[in-house]
Amino acid sequence: MSERFHLSVPVAALVAAIAGGATIAGAWGFELIAGLEPCPLCLQQRWPYYAGVPLAIAALALGRAGRTRGAGIALVAVAAVMAAGAGLGIYHAGIEWGIWEGPSACSGGGTIPRDASRLLESLGEGRIPSCAEASWRFLGLSLAGYNALIASALALAAASGAHGALARRTAG
């Protein structure tokens, strides 16, 4: 891979930190402001961002301190967790499109209690949204689909920066 085709450590780390932070802020915004309740898989898709954003910030700090190898390793970790996030997004989008079945925890709904006292108790429990129903779509893609695209792009950006950092380190 030519030197001109990969990102520098600071650029890759900033892209991952800023875009990752904006993505997780958007997820929280859809939940808290727009009122879209996340399903169990939606919540799991946030985990790579919770890990990836601090790792990207660490990569930036290591790079600025001249620790290129450490920054490269941190970016490899960012790429790995974002690739896992992309996989979760693809899996979730596939469930929404009916390509495969989701886990039983994602069935949504629930049973209606037959006992009147249990019915009153169940009123405060709330409904778990189904992973198979996209709560929002734009241009045909659900939030899970957009997460798959964003996480893939962040994984590629981090891998590009890691390649540049580690290739320079081994070449020099």
Where are the regions that the model predicts?
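Structural signal for the C-terminal ends of transmembrane alpha-helices
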Residues: A58-G66, A159-L166
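Loop-to-helix transition at the N-terminal end of transmembrane alpha-helices
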Residues: L36-Y50
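Hydrophobic alpha-helical segments of small multi-pass membrane proteins
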Residues: A56, L75-G89, C106-R114, A151, ...
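C-terminal TM-helix exit segments that contain a strictly Trp-centered aromatic cap at the helix terminus
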Residues: A22-E31, A83-I99, S117
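Interfacial segments of alpha-helical transmembrane regions
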Residues: H6-I18, L62-A86, L156
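A hydrophobic membrane-anchoring alpha-helix module
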Residues: E125-G172
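Membrane-interfacial, low-structure loops and terminal tails that flank and connect transmembrane helices
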Residues: M1-S8, R168-G172
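Extracytosolic (periplasmic/ER-lumenal) interhelical loops and adjacent juxtamembrane/interface segments
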Residues: W97-S142
